[in-house]
From Swiss-Prot:
Coiled-coil regions listed: none
Family annotation (PANTHER family): GTPASE DER
InterPro entries, per the entry: G_ENGA, GTP-bd, GTPase_Der, KH_dom-like, KH_dom-like_a/b, P-loop_NTPase, Small_GTP-bd
Organism: Paracoccus denitrificans (strain Pd 1222)
Location of the KH-like domain: 375-461
Region Disordered, annotated ranges: 454-489
Entry keywords, A to Z: GTP-binding, Nucleotide-binding, Repeat, Ribosome biogenesis
Protein name: GTPase Der
Sequence positions that bind GTP 2: 205-212, 252-256, 317-320
Length: 489
């Protein structure tokens, strides 16, 4: 059974705590400051045997339309329009407020189904507020405690008949799925994005670089808050969509400021949330403001993504505002190669999140980075390459002891990782390791993706020695048996 449940209500009534309880993870920021959730965020909800999409919304506030709170209210109203069920949460300890009455009227007019929940109703402190909730005209309120899990069985019973009705409706509208795969399909292609396994992308950057605007342009709707206020995205929001034919799940992260400037408690939580989003991503898009590119924080963000082993694409936003584009592009490429040598060759694309120009370039760069991140190179080709590299530039011989690179193999993908069997690995200089990594990038067309290269000291061992010895012994024994004459002949 699948349906969408939107949690709505005033700020600080416990919506995000309830969201976290329903998804079974700490996905939404929770704090006692009002207005911590500023965007819509989705999660996979679970209650008993019910499975559904749960949406955590910004707090409903009466505000002017052009204010930040006004834009938050419009986003929440959109969630109400799109949801199958709205769970309207009030604070039982505070009681029914004028804002509750105002938004209850909106829900009566706009929502398909409304369930009223009086949160924080545990103990006597919430009794009066729970009784007041009857006056909202939305039916009997459920008395719950999102923090302690009380009342979840009542919520389950309220959802079951609705879920069954949605299930009957979905059966009629469901597309064909679980199509059998024919024999002979290439199993090595299973990493390619699909509806069941969308490509996961994190968009990171400094505050107000245009991350939410870019994602809204990809989505074709104002799903995420945008505006002139730096840092209006606080949570790491993930949304699923089809980006030019590619199924993707995109994380819009909170803007990452320098640590010295991160003083607000909630903003510290948001930055940590953004860093977690990088770990969930396959490709990380580092979004720069072309007017002030490659500031110290941009470099730290890109370096963090590389350290985490993610494929990286650098996108310079607000390109529509740049007058001398050829000269600016030349400057960007030079600065990129000089300041981020660890991401040598990573795609650098220019975009305008406002107009949508350059989205095709960004899409192609993301797909290329993802393909390289999943690259698998045959061992035979690697060893031919290693032989060529060592002949062209032999390893040094510190103290007259020659370093021998005997064998290389790929041990991992996502990102590509290689192991070289060698002698005296402790004497191999970093410069020679960089020579090999750069060679792998260039010769196997792996720009930008992190490459992990480790060296395993074999001493004087030859990886083929034991195998060759066994083969020779087996051959000699076989010949000996054939030469033996039967006794008594």
């Amino acid at each position: 059974m699948s349906f969408t449940l939107a949690i709505v209500g005033r700020p600080n009534v416990g919506k995000s705590t309830l969201f976290n309880r329903l998804v079974g993870k700490r996905l939404a920021l929770v704090d006692d400051q009002p207005g911590v959730t500023r965007d819509l965020r989705e999660g996979a909800g679970r209650l008993g045997d019910l499975r559904f999409i749960v949406v955590d919304s910004a707090g409903l506030e009466i505000a002017e339309d052009d204010s930040l709170q006004g834009r938050m209210r419009r986003l929440t109203e959109r969630a109400v329009d799109e949801a199958d069920v709205c769970l309207f949460v009030i604070d039982a300890r505070v009681g029914v407020t004028a804002a509750d009455e105002y938004f209850a009227d909106i829900l009566r007019r706009r929502a398909r189904h409304v369930i009223l929940a009086a949160n924080k109703a545990e103990g006597r402190a919430g009794e009066a507020g729970a009784m007041e909730a009857y006056a909202l005209g939305l039916g009997e309120p459920l008395r719950i405690s999102a923090e302690h899990g009380e009342g979840m069985d009542d919520l389950y019973r309220a959802l079951v008949p609705l879920a069954e009705a949605f299930e009957a409706q979905n059966v009629q509208q469901a597309p064909e799925t679980d199509v059998a795969v024919e024999d002979g399909d290439d199993e090595t292609e299973d990493w390619r994005p699909s509806e069941s396994k969308p490509l996961q992308i994190a968009v990171i950057g400094r505050p107000n670089a245009g991350k939410s605007t870019l994602i809204n342009k990809i989505l074709g709707e104002d799903r995420l808050l945008t505006g002139p206020e730096a840092g209006i995205t606080r949570d790491s929001i993930s949304v699923s969509t089809n980006f030019m034919g590619t199924p993707v799940r995109i994380f819009d992260t909170a803007g990452m400021r320098k640590k010295a400037r991160v003083t607000d408690k909630v903003e510290k939580l948001s930055v940590a949330d953004g860093l977690r989003a990088v770990r969930f991503a396959e490709v990380v898009v580092v979004l720069l403001d072309v007017g002030i590119p490659f500031e110290q924080q941009d470099l730290r963000i890109a370096d963090f993504a590389e350290t985490e082993g993610r494929a990286v694409v650098v996108a310079a936003n607000k390109w529509d505002l740049e007058e001398d584009k050829p000269e600016k592009l030349k400057e960007l490429r030079e600065a990129f190669e000089r300041l981020l040598p660890q991401l040598k060759g990573a795609p650098l694309v220019t975009v305008s999140a406002r107009t949508g120009k350059g989205l095709d370039r960004l899409h192609n760069a993301i797909l290329k980075a993802h393909e390289v991140w999943n690259r698998r190179i045959p061992t035979a080709r690697l060893n031919q390459w290693l032989s060529t590299m060592t002949e062209a530039h032999p390893p040094p011989a510190p103290g007259g002891r020659r370093i021998r690179l005997r064998y290389i193999t790929q041990v991992k993908t996502r990102p590509p990782a290689f192991v070289v069997m060698a002698t005296h690995t402790d004497k191999l200089p970093d410069s020679y390791q960089r020579y090999l990594v750069n060679g792998l990038r260039q010769d196997f067309d792996m720009p930008g993706t992190p490459i992990r290269l480790t060296f395993r000291d074999q001493g004087t061992k030859n990886p083929y020695k034991d195998k060759a010895s066994k083969i020779n012994q087996s051959g000699a024994l076989s010949k000996h048996k054939h030469r033996q004459k039967p006794k008594g002949s």
